Amino acid sequence: MKVEFDYKSLGLKVGLEIHRQLDTKKLFSAVPSQLHDNVDFTFERRLRPTMSELGEIDQAALEEFKRGRAFVYEGNYKYTDLVYVDEEPPHMPDEEALKVALQITYLLNAIPVDEVHFMRKIVIDGSNVSGFQRTAIVGMNGKVDTPWGSVGIPTICLEEDACRIIEQGERKAIYRLDRLGIPLIEIATTPDIHHPEQAKIVAKFIGDALRATRKVKRGLGTIRQDLNVSIKGGARIEIKGVQELDMIPVIIEREVQRQLNLLKIKEELQKRGVKEEDLKEEFYDVTDIFSGTGSKIIARTLKKGGKILAIKLPKFRGLIGFEIQPGRRLGTEMADRAKKYVKGIFHIDELPNYGISQEEVDKVVERLNLGEFDAFVLVAAEEEIAKKALREILQRAREAISGVPEETRRALPDGNTQYMRPLPGKARMYPETDIPPIFMSEELKKEILENLPEYPQAKVNRYVKEYKIDKSLAQTLVDDERDELFEELIAMGIKPSLAASILVVVLKGLKKEVSTDNITETHIKDAFKLLHENKIAKEALEEIFKELALHPEKTALQVAEEKGLTLLSEGEVEKIIEEIVRENIDVVKEKGMGAMGMLMGRAMAKLRGKADGKLVNQLVRKKIQEFTS
């Protein structure tokens, strides 16, 4: 059952960060910005954190460094050069990417900067060969108006995208260099969003502005939406990787639910008098208790020479199993923290289970000398690994006493979230010394401002008013980026309603039968040209497009001729209709014009795609009158 929250009284604050790839060359070299699967070379690196310009080290970077992983990079000579293996300084930023960033700045009601200064953002998870990402502010102080009020856009940044992850491992990660350096626009809002639906409206507005440029990439992985969510008494949580617009409200609702439940746990721990110093780093070796266990997981660990270690969590019983999101508990949060070392954990609130018996549970309780409200957590692994995992669990338990820890979390498909790493600090940036400041001239700003593309929603409204087409058709044309083609067809003399119907309804319907991706804009324009020249009927379009999807090497005219879809002359059509009327003369004489429907059905069965429906109607009517007068 969906829980309704009073977001105003909860003090909900949400900010968005939207990242979208630009469809230009790479940001700091002229190689193509395309993904590929061909690997020509590989190399290995290890990365270390450095101090920011303030002399501080970012905690998220430090935590990644402690994992001690090596990074293997796969490259292709066509899509990677020396810049992106960090063996050559960056070239000057791509001019087209800068112009698109400036367009987006104006579309979001923001003010462009006078000079673009690139900075280095420390990233040592392996996704950047150099250990940093280059980023620059191009616009500031934009805004989005919503029914709940205005939401600010303090910064619009142009940056380089990271490598593509191929394989993650405990000791090694493999990345592909093809995505590294693809220009990325990053748009951040102020935390002035106070309702989940408001967040969706803001995200759509920004997405529409990006699409209006016609210079953003489409498809899986080209857009990444991050949320920053907090409530009164809770903490700021960064949620990464929200893919679908419709999931934004769901994820926010679930995060509010999670924080409220964590605050309930905090309150209960305070009632029980738990203090951080009560949670001691004392590991208990309980391996002997499980020597004859029925748990397959534990038995496998013991067979490999591993151990079963336990820690005591005073007064946590009943709270580790407390549900904080649908299907997720405080114990799940603890397990997420331990996952960098072990696959899973066992805790008292879920036992007996997983082959662990009540007798084994009782023995652990006795060994740890647990009281009525005390809990334990078990880990099965090599001794040192088990200790590392239990330290993570102990840290998460200490954080539970304070309520909601600040974290970066991963969005899950069901709307829940999962721990990724500590929230990055501000100690991540330092100046980029290889790229001089870029002056944004008044002439360039004026040129961009005077040639801004039409905003998508304004275009939808114009289509409805000017071309008298249904709003849902107009919206789909714009959302699917078929609007330019639509306007070209109208310029050819095609009726707007027909053009919209074919582009939206017919072609989408064909997707169920054939791969419409094979149908090019040239195919579509050529087919409509045949229609405009009265060489085919509009009824023939669907069959022509279906055949072109199967055989894209053919032309629309070839298909029309091969399939016998070219229009018959009026005389040929009249002759066929007269034959149909003669075959049904008794019905015609009996019903007169009442036979119109039946005759039209039979005529169209023979003439569909070979004659215009309007002409067929006129000639059927004419023949009925001739034979009944």
UniProtKB/Swiss-Prot annotation:
Catalysed reaction, written as an equation: L-glutamyl-tRNA(Gln) + L-glutamine + ATP + H2O = L-glutaminyl-tRNA(Gln) + L-glutamate + ADP + phosphate + H(+)
Residue ranges, annotated region (Disordered): 405-426
Gene Ontology BP terms: glutaminyl-tRNAGln biosynthesis via transamidation; translation
KW Magnesium (keyword) present: no
Any GO MF annotation of the entry: aminoacyl-tRNA ligase activity
InterPro entries for the chain: Asn/Gln-tRNA_amidoTrfase_suB/E, Asn/Gln-tRNA_Trfase_suB/E_cat, Asn/Gln_amidotransferase, Asn/Gln_tRNA_amidoTrase-B-like, GAD-like_sf, GAD_dom, GatB_C_1, GatB_Yqey_C_2
UniProt GO cellular component terms: cytoplasm
Membrane-crossing residue ranges in chain numbering: none
Listed SMART domains: GatB_Yqey (SM00845)
Pfam family for this entry, one: GatB_N
EC main group: ligase
Domain of life (superkingdom): Archaea
EC number(s) recorded for this UniProt protein: 6.3.5.-
Keywords: ATP-binding, Ligase, Nucleotide-binding, Protein biosynthesis
Subunit structure of this chain's protein: Heterodimer of GatD and GatE.
PANTHER family per record: GLUTAMYL-TRNA GLN AMIDOTRANSFERASE SUBUNIT B MITOCHONDRIAL AND PROKARYOTIC PET112-RELATED, GLUTAMYL-TRNA(GLN) AMIDOTRANSFERASE SUBUNIT E
Function: Allows the formation of correctly charged Gln-tRNA(Gln) through the transamidation of misacylated Glu-tRNA(Gln) in organisms which lack glutaminyl-tRNA synthetase. The reaction takes place in the presence of glutamine and ATP through an activated gamma-phospho-Glu-tRNA(Gln). The GatDE system is specific for glutamate and does not act on aspartate.
Family (UniProt): Belongs to the GatB/GatE family. GatE subfamily.
Protein name, as recorded: Glutamyl-tRNA(Gln) amidotransferase subunit E
